[in-house]
């Protein structure tokens, strides 16, 4: 059970990292070009400066997430708190973008998925810190045996699938003048 919890936690962290980095990078088109996009996205023009900041912060949070997840999985000091900081930064940047999208254009997709996954992962990371679970799962010490390699491999596999499948799940929300910009 402890091995499964460790693997599930790392997989969700990897998914959140992918969503955070791709979400930040994907927002760049709106952050720099909302006034020229037309349609619903043109409604985001008043907040272009804020979106530019969110792009930088989201990508930085995703990179910090890579660092913190490696520290956590290896049982290094500060790994858990660094991971919480990453998840809070990701949730805040995604939440602000969610708010702008909902109020200005009336739709939150695809950022809504990023926000939900980040908050869910944050809940997992907070729950594993409960004393009974924390002692069993062992994120405060280096993993034994093949557990770290298995968790890392599973996380890379799932992240790779998610990245390769991006045109499938992102395409419906990335149409510009009838052209699918996600393909």
Language model regions located:
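Topology signature of small-to-medium multi-pass alpha-helical membrane proteins
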Residues: 1-183
